[in-house]
Regions:
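Sec-dependent signal peptide cleavage junction
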Residues: 15-29
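Core segments of small alpha/beta cavity-forming domains
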Residues: 29-117
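Terminal targeting/leader modules
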Residues: 22, 146-155, 160-161, 176
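Short acidic DE-rich linear segments
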Residues: 7, 23-27, 179-182
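Short beta-strand edge/turn micro-motifs at domain boundaries
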Residues: 159-182
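Bacterial N-terminal signal peptides
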Residues: 8-16
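Surface-exposed, charged secondary-structure patches
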Residues: 109-155
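Positively charged n-region of N-terminal signal peptides that target proteins for export
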Residues: 1-4, 8
């Protein structure tokens, strides 16, 4: 009986220490290279889905193929999963800071037109192999981390250098530029 009580006390003493360590890591400034790469690839996917006006993973999505001209730019309506500013913002918010989303809407002329979200028609994607990029932390201040990526071209011709800044917003790491991973 004494052994059982000793074991239970040991477990009770160890569990709170482990739980507090896990909680500390959740709110600490730590950001691993694996997390950085995963978030960067997710940001790239979210950016290109936004620019195409459609998320291929969305279920029951409906899209209009109608194009129109807005401020001299051929534009198209976004599919139903991005039909409102709130829906599109909710899609982008887990990956990008509020400031990145706001500035990205302005930079890329993402607009609400006749009550529906629309985006200028573009060429889409580039020839960089982001999944094969190497990462180097180049700046670390409080809740901000900047990484330099060396991204090989898919045709093997050149390696592009890109800098991506991560900011801790609402206790979660997010990317501070909508087009950071293009």
């Amino acid at each position: 009986m004494k052994k059982l009580i000793v074991c239970l006390l040991a477990v009770l003493l160890i569990l709170p220490a482990g739980a507090s360590l896990a909680a500390k890591n959740q709110t600490s400034g730590n950001l691993t290279n694996k997390q950085v790469m995963q978030m960067t690839l997710q940001a790239r996917e979210h950016f290109w889905n936004t620019m195409s006006g459609h998320n291929p993973k969305a279920k029951n999505s409906t899209c209009q193929t109608k194009t129109f001209e807005y401020r001299g730019l051929p534009s198209t309506y976004m599919c139903s999963e991005f039909s409102t500013k709130a829906k599109l913002t909710d899609y982008l918010a887990p990956v990008f800071t509020k400031d990145a989303i706001k500035k990205g809407f302005e930079k890329y002329n993402i607009m609400s037109y006749k009550g529906k979200m629309a985006v200028p028609v573009g060429d889409g994607d580039n020839l960089l192999g982001w999944d094969k990029a190497t990462i180097k932390l180049i700046s670390q201040k409080n809740n901000t981390r900047t990484y330099e990526f060396s991204v090989p071209a898919l045709d093997g011709s050149v390696t592009a250098k890109r800098k991506i800044t991560f900011v801790k917003e609402d206790n979660k790491w997010k990317i501070n530029q909508l087009d950071a991973a293009i």
